[in-house]
Design a protein with these regions (language model features):
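Formylglycine-dependent sulfatase
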Residues: 6-14, 19-233
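Positively charged n-region of N-terminal signal peptides that target proteins for export
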Residues: 1-5
Length: 233
């Protein structure tokens, strides 16, 4: 398998529109409806793009700069919660955790009836004539110590999802040695595996394939990057 470099991959994901909002009616995308790329990155610090002032690190981020130049840059965006599940549920529903009732990673929002009548982000685009594709960590993923589960992925609004609706994340390569102190579920260290075995590479390569596939409708593509969540990679 030929590895597609992660920086080149990110550089290829430049489809955000900087145009004004389209006034759409359900099921009918506007004539100039843009393709929309939604990228979620876990545990990401405020590195770049360089258009942002006050970053604590001086890091060159040419691909983020390119995204900012060709897309929409929010300079005053904030996270509604400091943990994964309430934050991602808030983003995908458009509601504050005080409204969703999701305050912790263990809260199963899929079992909450209040979401039955809430329009989720991919549902909105699907109802307005978009092809909606998702892959990787979009909703909160891991439950307990099981890294091969769909987590809290909702199938609502997606035409397709990678790897599948039953497995939100590709199974990650992890060190084989377990901690000897009885806590945690993996040891610190490298895996000895090639980059193409890493879940994020699989997700990004899948996303590039979708971008290279001709679409007969505007595309909403959600790409969830799991790293740098883990400290060892």
């Amino acid at each position: 398998m030929k590895v597609k470099p992660i920086l080149s991959a990110l550089g290829s994901l430049l489809v955000l529109s900087a145009g004004g909002p389209s006034h759409l009616t359900a099921g009918e995308p506007g004539k100039d409806a843009p393709n929309i790329l939604f990228v979620a990155i876990d545990d990401f610090n405020d590195w770049g793009p360089t258009q942002l002032d006050g970053a604590p690190f001086e890091v060159d981020t040419p691909n983020f700069d390119a995204l900012a130049d060709r897309g929409i840059l929010f300079t005053n965006a904030h996270c509604n919660a400091p943990s994964c599940n309430p934050s991602r549920t808030s983003i995908m529903s458009g509601l504050h955790p005080a409204s969703t009732g999701v305050y912790a990673n263990g809260h199963d929002w899929l079992a909450n009836e209040r979401f039955d009548d809430i329009l989720l982000l991919p549902e909105y685009f699907q109802q307005h004539g978009y092809t909606t594709l998702g892959g990787g960590k979009i909703y909160h993923a891991n439950q307990g110590n099981d890294f091969n589960r769909k987590g809290l992925l909702s199938p609502r609004g997606w035409a397709d999802f990678f790897p599948s609706f039953e497995e939100q994340l590709p199974v990650p390569s992890m060190p084989d040695i377990k901690p000897d102190h009885g806590e945690g579920n993996f040891n610190w260290g490298g895996t000895g595996k090639p980059l193409e075995d890493m879940g994020d590479h699989k997700v990004v390569n899948w996303a590039i394939d979708q971008l290279e596939t001709p679409q007969d409708k505007p595309l909403f593509l959600a790409v969830g990057i799991y790293r740098p969540h883990m400290p060892w990679f």
